[in-house]
Amino acid sequence: MPTPSMEDYIEQIYLLIDEKGYARVSDIAEALSVHPSSVTKMVQKLDKDEYLIYEKYRGLVLTTKGKKIGERLVYRHDLLEQFMRIIGVDESKIYNDVEGIEHHLSWEAIDRIGDLVQYFEQDTVRVETLRGVQRANEEKSN
């Protein structure tokens, strides 16, 4: 199992390859706001653990294992963002909130959150009802 830090790199590499068709050390460093030498060290570790294939100066390619995990990590992140929107978290806080919790939830919890997102998306009245509860609670606290 990858560590939370490894997950961040795999997720970002997956997104870059999906968006650009490739992922360079400099692109990964910029996206994660880290030094390129840190990226190189992590990429070498991910190569050793068979999440990707890395050749210095030639770029990198995710292995089947890396692609599968990358896809699952992107799904988890997107699902948690959807969940935050449904429960009414301010848009400007969603990304940081998701980054703060995504590595601490079990895959079972992610699956149950997925069920809840699906439940709310199947009937918009449910979201409206939730908003009504939130408004009532805000009025009580004022």
From Swiss-Prot:
GO terms for MF: DNA binding; DNA-binding transcription factor activity; manganese ion binding; protein dimerization activity
What this protein is reported to do is described as: Central regulator of manganese homeostasis.
Q: What is the lineage of its organism?
A: Bacteria, Bacillati, Bacillota, Bacilli, Bacillales
> PROSITE patterns under this entry?
HTH_DTXR
Q: Which InterPro entries match?
A: DtxR_MntR_Metal-Reg, Fe_dep_repressor, Fe_dep_repressor_sf, HTH_DTXR, HTH_tscrpt_reg_MntR, Iron_dep_repressor, WH-like_DNA-bd_sf, WH_DNA-bd_sf
Q: How does it assemble?
A: Homodimer.
Keywords for this entry? Activator, Cytoplasm, DNA-binding, Manganese, Metal-binding, Repressor, Transcription, Transcription regulation
Query: Which SUPFAM superfamilies does its entry note?
Result: Iron-dependent repressor protein, dimerization domain (SSF47979), Winged helix' DNA-binding domain (SSF46785)
Please identify the protein, giving its name as recorded: HTH-type transcriptional regulator MntR
Membrane-spanning segments: none
- The positions annotated for binding Mn(2+) 1 are 8, 99, 102-103
Q: Which organism encodes this protein?
A: Bacillus cereus (strain ATCC 14579 / DSM 31 / CCUG 7414 / JCM 2152 / NBRC 15305 / NCIMB 9373 / NCTC 2599 / NRRL B-3711)
Q: Where does Mn(2+) 2 bind?
A: 11, 77, 99, 102
A single Pfam family it belongs to is Fe_dep_repress
Compartments where found: Cytoplasm
The residue ranges of the HTH dtxR-type domain are 1-63
